[in-house]
Amino acid sequence: MENIKLAVIGLGYVGLPLARLFATRYPVVGYDVKRERVAALMEGRDATQEVSDELLRSVLLPRLPEEGEAGLFCTSDAEQLRGCNYYIVAVPTPVDLHHSPDLTPLYSASETVGKVLGRGDIVIYESTVCPGITEDECVPLSLIHI
């Protein structure tokens, strides 16, 4: 597997540890809509402690990774995802009082990926969804701009 550049969409309790681990071997761009969270992560601080500050700092890059350069760069600018060829969507799918999932974050992430997706790129949905949601709703949103 050569020329891998990963994007992890959603830097929460699933996305951040995943991004950190992949960044030990591959170039990774971590994306989150929460600018304050991204700023803290880029300073090497994870308030949730999903990843220790020491482990986080060990993989952080001050800029987008170059081809073949292992490390993690975090951003809230979706344009900086352009050039990645593997996208892992790890956004929350919270449920309401009636136990119905709120798929808004998933739809938004699918649209974000779709704007930078290239032919042959791979999208992996890590978020928990009901059967059929990925194929019927997320994929069409991702492909709308190709």
Task: Place the predicted regions along the sequence by residue.
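Hydrophobic packing residues within well-ordered alpha-helices of enzyme cores
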Residues: 41, 56, 134-142
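NAD(P)+-binding Rossmann beta1-loop-alpha1 motif at the extreme N-terminus of oxidoreductases
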Residues: 1-46
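Rossmann-like NAD(P)-binding element
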Residues: 64-125, 130-133
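Conserved small/polar residues in nucleotide/adenosyl-binding loops
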Residues: 144-146
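N-terminal glycine-rich dinucleotide-binding loop that anchors FAD/FMN and/or NAD(P) in oxidoreductases
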Residues: 46-71
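Short, hinge-like loop/turn segments at secondary-structure boundaries
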Residues: 46-50, 90, 141-142
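Phosphate-coordinating loops and pocket residues in cytosolic domains that bind phosphorylated ligands
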Residues: 42-43, 50, 83
